[in-house]
Amino acid sequence: KTNSNYQQEFRQLGMQLMGRMDAEEWKEFYAKLVYWELELDNIEDSGMREIFEMQKKEANKLFCDFIEDNYLDWVNGTEDAPQMIHTLVKDKIAPFIGKEKTAVLVIDNLRFDQWKMIEPILSRYFTKEEEEIVFSILPTATHYARNAFFAGLLPSGIEKRFPTLWKNEDDE
């Protein structure tokens, strides 16, 4: 059943890859890829897995092209940016602070596919209010991304605003 369902979806995903996707469409596309990756992990058909890996490789290449074409416009504010990690606290968490109990669980380096694998375990203890794929900053290295998340600034902004506290990765 999984094989035939993926074969049908494979064609639709392939058509999407041939089109020009915006950030929201890329997020939806990635969520579908993660779904199928986890589904195909449960079957023994290595041929289907190979086909999926080829499609995923093509998607990664096209997504890299998309990021190259758009990232600077997003961080420079010249184009409407998707939700990014350095604006997440301001946009999604701060509005709830002081109004209701709020907890934020940050797991460094957690990809969406890894989240989907542990989500069933955590859902026994926590209620998920919202789920959204967000774009990281570049580079995605912990030193930069984690600081950007908590500061609400890009690394260059942190360095300008807090010059005595900021250290480049090479300085540590």
Regions found by a protein language model. Give the residues of each.
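…; additionally, a secondary subgroup of soluble metalloenzymes is captured
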Residues: 1-102, 109-172
